[in-house]
């Protein structure tokens, strides 16, 4: 397995790259989040990679962060989700945004990505639950979600509310609200239905 490639960036044409590593040119596909952070052609580049061996091809996918690569690995484990769709997901949203969408069960955020329909989005939410560090606030480099929001969510779950109900109620709690006040506001939102 090829886990990392470092060399000179020879070509970049979204989402494809050609990286020269000691005279060997590696074709690598990357998500747009990685593509936008690449240096200019002719510069040195280092990418974490995932190699996929198929009957008709050996394919390399490159990532700027370990979190992106791990998320890609989780995505391609899902039945019906291939590397092309996994790259589309990572191109359409950050790892942190995906983790939040999974935690809050927001299929609508996923359906905005080309190639992801309602059924595929629902399958992604189901299969990724608990596999991305998807608890609120646990994805490094993403938008911070306070520990208080996580505590409020956990309290609602402990009270017997479903993940979806709790996630919807959390959206009604303003950022920076303390735990006890957050629970009160979330319960009020749940009682309104």
From Swiss-Prot:
Residues 1-64 are annotated as: Domain I. SUPFAM superfamilies: DNA helicase RuvA subunit, C-terminal domain (SSF46929), Nucleic acid-binding proteins (SSF50249), RuvA domain 2-like (SSF47781). Residues 151-193 are annotated as: Domain III. It is found in: Cytoplasm. Keywords: Cytoplasm, DNA damage, DNA recombination, DNA repair, DNA-binding. One of its GO terms (biological process) is DNA repair. The keyword Nucleotide-binding does not apply. Pfam families: HHH_5, RuvA_C, RuvA_N. InterPro entries: DNA_helicase_Holl-junc_RuvA_I, Hlx-hairpin-Hlx_DNA-bd_motif, NA-bd_OB-fold, RuvA, RuvA_2-like, RuvA_C, RuvA_C_sf. Residues 144-151 are annotated as: Flexible linker. Residues 65-143 are annotated as: Domain II. One of its GO terms (cellular component) is Holliday junction resolvase complex. One of its GO terms (molecular function) is four-way junction helicase activity. Has three domains with a flexible linker between the domains II and III and assumes an 'L' shape. Domain III is highly mobile and contacts RuvB. HAMAP family: DNA_HJ_migration_RuvA. Homotetramer. Forms an RuvA(8)-RuvB(12)-Holliday junction (HJ) complex. HJ DNA is sandwiched between 2 RuvA tetramers; dsDNA enters through RuvA and exits via RuvB. An RuvB hexamer assembles on each DNA strand where it exits the tetramer. Each RuvB hexamer is contacted by two RuvA subunits (via domain III) on 2 adjacent RuvB subunits; this complex drives branch migration. In the full resolvosome a probable DNA-RuvA(4)-RuvB(12)-RuvC(2) complex forms which resolves the HJ. Belongs to the RuvA family. This is Holliday junction branch migration complex subunit RuvA. The gene is ruvA.
